Amino acid sequence: MQDIEPFYNWRHIYISEEDQRSPFFGRTYSEFEFSQTVYNYYIHPQWDDFGSRTLYLKTLLADYDEKYAVIELIGEWNDAIENDIMELKREVLEKFMYEGITKFILIAENVLNFHSSNSDYYEELYDELSDEGGWVVCLNMPSQTQYDFKKAHLNRYIELMELDNWRTYKPFHLFKKIDGELTARLH
């Protein structure tokens, strides 16, 4: 896991630690000192800690004009013990929502497990974003993780989508593709 870096090909467009509106503004990173772990496995030092002991993230892009953010996740999403959705909502998503972001693309291909609890925070997040015309999409969640996510019926609140070649898109084009697909599903 220490070799899995956050996607960095958009860093010429956006760097979360340099964005004064980002929850991660001012953070500094080491390229050589591995200190964060998911269980006993070290992860690359570029990932951001947001309060969970098993799930980390990197904000790849926040576009305040178009009102969307792309966030990559790594680790285990554990609502049963860690209440990760509460931490993610309170410590990251709400801070972006306060800045006007209403649409979130969560890249979940490195979320290896999911353990559910109740759906309260998912429902709350869905309601808050829907009121503003927003949404949350989990992109490329592994099938075993999707199984547990769907079993808890959380896909009512967070859309699950597949787009294997998302890295080939520019951020705005990725957003427009996903936004267009969601709009088409609703009509």
Feature annotation, model-predicted:
Residues Q2-F50, L60-Y64, A69-L73, W77-N110, ...:
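Amphipathic, Lys/Arg-enriched alpha-helical "gate/interface" segment within cytosolic domains
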